[in-house]
Amino acid sequence: MQPIEIYTSSTCGYCFAAKRLLNQKGVSYAEINIQMEPERRAEMITRAAGQSSVPQIFIGTQHIGGCDQLFNLERSGKLD
């Protein structure tokens, strides 16, 4: 599987849910916490075509979207 990056914040329930799903599947990912690294927020918004909410999830260079989209991939068997 291509590298996964997930932009998060420390207090985001959807971020915790997305990370929990990835952890349960044994998938490694790079977490970018925009509260700890606020300078990365602009990068996230640019990469996510203007989306400013977290989580924003990328698999390789493809923008997946947020938590709902990640769970949709899981339901359709595309995270395996």
Residue ranges of model-derived segments:
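Amphipathic alpha-helical interface surfaces
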Residues: A18, R40, G66-Q69
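Glycine-/small-residue-rich active-site loops that bind phosphorylated ligands and cofactors
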Residues: G13, M36, I64
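Non-catalytic, surface beta->alpha helical segment in thiol-disulfide oxidoreductase systems
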Residues: I59-D80
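Rhodanese-like catalytic fold shared by cysteine-dependent sulfurtransferases
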Residues: Q24-V27, R47, L73-D80
